[in-house]
Amino acid sequence: NYKTVNFLAVVGRTYTFKVVAEGETFVSSSTIPALVPLLGIDFIPSSFFGITGNIIVPKFLDPAGVKNSYVFYFYNADSLDQNSGYIFANDDFADGQLNQQPFFGNWSPESGDSVIYEMYGIDTPVFVYYFSFEQNTSGNSGAPANPVSNWSNNALGYFTAQNFQSFSALVP
């Protein structure tokens, strides 16, 4: 985990990370996409396969004509170790539309729970990494393969420059 001080990230700028290890050079780059404002979250009461709670729907308006990709996390604010895992999406099927897609996770918030929702804007190569990682670990793929990385020299993993926003709400 690398951190810098007095560093201001700029939307639209491409950042490059270079690592030299044991005589080999690994390079990755990522561009910070424009922020798509998170307008809030809706809760839809649900009883699904015997589990009752609420499904979370993040509200945001995807800009038309611009390729956007996202990663979402949500947590029970009273127990931050109880989280949904991550959910990733892009605008291939909802370009320019208000998000209506509910997100299902490992946890279903109940009435009275305090929820923290995080939304990250990521560039396309990072989305491709998440997508290929999910395809290879879901149990529904063919032969196992490494996820598509945005690193050179066949390195695994990803480097990301991203925007971030957070929203908290009490489940009604």
Enumerate the language-model features and the residues they cover:
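A sequence/structural signal for flexible, mid-protein segments enriched
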Residues: 1-172
